Amino acid sequence: MSLSKKLTLDKVDLKGKRVIMRVDFNVPMKNKEITNNQRIKAALPSINYCLDNGAKSVVLMSHLGRPDGVPMPDKYSLEPVAAELKSLLGKDVLFLKDCVGPEVEQACANPPNGSIILLENLRFHVEEEGKGKDASGNKIKAEPAKMEAFQASLSKLGDVYVNDAFGTAHRAHSSMVGVNLPQKACGFLMKKELTYFAKALDSPERPFLAILGGAKVADKIQLINNMLDKVNEMIIGGGMGFTFLKVLNNMEIGTSLFDEEGAKIVKDLMAKAEKNGVKITLPVDFVTADKFDENAKTGQATLASGIPAGWMGLDCGPKSSKKYVEVVTWAKQIVWNGPVGVFEWEEFARGTKELMNNVVEATKRGCITIIGGGDTATCCAKWNTEDKVSHVSTGGGASLELLEGKVLPGVSTLNNV
């Protein structure tokens, strides 16, 4: 799947056209109030571009939460997003109480020029995901004929399809792959994601470093495997590190995370690294805790001493951080997926925070730094480094699947140029 060869919004003639745009407005809410509008703001450049370039209308569609195909307007309505959009754009936004059907089709057929229309939550229909739950909570599958009708109805709402929802690009949902229009382009947010990942995966700057953290080796086997074909160096930290250290060094790890499934493949991964000439850096010292708790008693341990019974490693120690700095300083391109400690708790955040500072410094001297979504993106938000690295991905699952070498359905369906 070539990421850099997709039709982009700026290459489409929009004059007089109705644009139907898949966005990611899956924003956090409390009592129907939006607590973080970042995802809405991220879609504004694409929306404004359409309006500035003569589009007749922009119809926006998104999911919110997991209603599983059951309409839950009290809990998961996108109506509060319409109000937020209106204040951000300074323009009226028409909110429709459904996303398909005759009334919606009529409202979108010939709207006044320059209209902005927001549809209700796509996931109120089981046909969006293809599966869901009935009113009693039993799992159900969508009927193929109804899915076709759902997709056909969405397709009537625009003349041009634009996808700007990278966060959902790994899902083959109706709004991602089922809108059947001649022109299917990526919006500016999607374009930025694809540009950075194409650079990382197809033509990386070297030396290329991957920093991989997180808990389970089994969850990251495909990621490690694929990246071993791409990188020059790899740091493996976080909870995953303990599985590697126990298998390779027979280290005592106390009650630290150990992944039985992942342990079986550690030696194969190391053999592949050696064959490909990839240098792997593992932690050598640890901040320990007597229980998995923010206020646990803390201690120190090293690779040589091991972690005592009843204790667990929740962060890397200063010697590991020093090793990581050396590797980061050498790199010309970095992809980082997964924290190297329990960064949510102050006592165990130092390792990840120090690594973040080093990645920021690397960016200043011209290194291309790409932060995979999910927890690592949360770290950037927590320490205000989002604009101090080259790119923070908006899609945790989508960026992970790209780095694993998978094809993203929401991208492959877009027109090639």
Curated annotation (Swiss-Prot):
Annotated positions binding ADP: G214, G238, F343
Positions of modified residues (N6-malonyllysine): K131
CDD domains noted in UniProt: Phosphoglycerate_kinase
Amino-acid positions noted as binding (2R)-3-phosphoglycerate in the UniProt annotation, renumbered to this chain: V23, D24, F25, N26, Q38, R39, S62, H63, G65, R66, L122, R123, H170, R171
Cited InterPro entries: Phosphoglycerate_kinase (IPR001576), Phosphoglycerate_kinase_CS (IPR015911), Phosphoglycerate_kinase_N (IPR015824), Phosphoglycerate_kinase_sf (IPR036043)
GO biological process per UniProt: gluconeogenesis; glycolytic process
Phosphoserine: residues carrying this PTM: S2, S4, S203
PROSITE patterns assigned to the protein according to its UniProt record, in alphabetical order: PGLYCERATE_KINASE
Known catalytic reactions: (2R)-3-phosphoglycerate + ATP = (2R)-3-phospho-glyceroyl phosphate + ADP; L-seryl-[protein] + ATP = O-phospho-L-seryl-[protein] + ADP + H(+)
Subcellular localization, as worded in the UniProt entry: Cytoplasm, Cytosol; Mitochondrion matrix
Residues modified to N-acetylserine: S2
N6-(2-hydroxyisobutyryl)lysine found at: K97, K216, K220, K323
Pathway: Carbohydrate degradation; glycolysis; pyruvate from D-glyceraldehyde 3-phosphate: step 2/5
Residue positions where Phosphotyrosine is found in the record: Y76, Y196
Positions bound to ATP: A215, K220, G239, G313, E344, D375, T376
Post-translational modification: Phosphorylated at Ser-203 by MAPK1/ERK2 under hypoxic conditions, which promotes its mitochondrial targeting.
Region spans: Mitochondrial targeting region exposed following cis-trans isomerization by PIN1 and recognized by the TOM complex for mitochondrial translocation of the protein: 38-43
GO molecular function, one term: protein serine kinase activity
One Pfam family recorded for the sequence: PGK
EC numbers: 2.7.11.1, 2.7.2.3
Sites where the protein binds Mg(2+): A215, A218, D219, D375
Modified residues (N6-acetyllysine): K11, K75, K86, K91, K97, K131, K146, K199, K267, K291
Record-level GO cellular component terms: cytosol; mitochondrial matrix
PANTHER family reported in the protein's UniProt record: PHOSPHOGLYCERATE KINASE
Protein name: Phosphoglycerate kinase 1
Record organism: Notamacropus eugenii
Species classification: Eukaryota, Metazoa, Chordata, Craniata, Vertebrata
Gene name, Swiss-Prot/TrEMBL: PGK1
